[in-house]
Curated annotation (Swiss-Prot):
CDD domains: Cis_IPPS. Predominantly expressed in latex. GO terms for molecular function: ditrans,polycis-polyprenyl diphosphate synthase [(2E,6E)-farnesyl diphosphate specific] activity; rubber cis-polyprenylcistransferase activity. GO terms for cellular component: endoplasmic reticulum. Keywords: Transferase. This is Rubber cis-polyprenyltransferase HRT2. Its EC number is 2.5.1.20. The keyword 4Fe-4S does not apply. Proposed to be involved in rubber biosynthesis as a particle-bound rubber transferase responsible for the cis-1,4-polymerization of isoprene subunits. Probably requires additional factors for the production of high molecular mass rubber. The keyword Repeat does not apply. SUPFAM superfamilies: Undecaprenyl diphosphate synthase. It is an enzyme of class 2 (transferase).
Amino acid sequence: MELYNGERPSVFRLLGKYMRKGLYSILTQGPIPTHIAFILDGNGRFAKKHKLPEGGGHKAGFLALLNVLTYCYELGVKYATIYAFSIDNFRRKPHEVQYVMNLMLEKIEGMIMEESIINAYDICVRFVGNLKLLDEPLKTAADKIMRATAKNSKFVLLLAVCYTSTDEIVHAVEESSKDKLKSDEICNDGNGDCVIKIEEMEPYSEIKLVELERNTYINPYPDVLIRTSGETRLSNYLLWQTTNCILYSPHALWPEIGLRHVVWAVINCQRHYSYLEKHKEYLK
């Protein structure tokens, strides 16, 4: 017998929302992380564990992602970065790669359809990584949602696609070198062409740290990095940015992640806040 005549889920959702508000009011008595990064590990193992059809783990993982992003938004976290697809993932079986690409395209197109809702919540969506490696439909869709949400600022969702940290560092060095070269160029007023006056160039022009960091894909640096499945490897993710970052590795597979894991990550960050702030000053 249906006691609530189909309304029970909405009642429980409402109750859960108020309970979260109470929990957040306690957590916000301490510092809240500005930026939380995630490695979504365990979708495949979750599918095997529950005998799901191919792709079932990724679909369950997407639902978990929506919940986690909701918690971050409600808690007042400003930035969330998701390791959505590594360049190294291209080494997987072609049909697996294509499935993930199709799923990403489907979800991005879904975001485009819900553009008004995303803008109402003031959410900015940014794709970061070597986006030239994406196929044209996916690249076009990503560009469309980025342009549509570019002016939003309350919550910034960074999706690392076709990303590895080593590729990012190479990109940052290349762009910094180009910037350095441009600073040595002097425009000829006669025809507008730029020439380099060798005699006026410095014999050694180093790239400064601030210049390199300006050309990385992902800023600001994360305060907490959560990797599910109990793994502590960074897997070529944010190697440059995690010098001063808490690593939290719950044993839950990614589709099993919940509010308690996000809360515990925030508490860990608060416990080590003083040390992390001192370390930041030391690194300056």
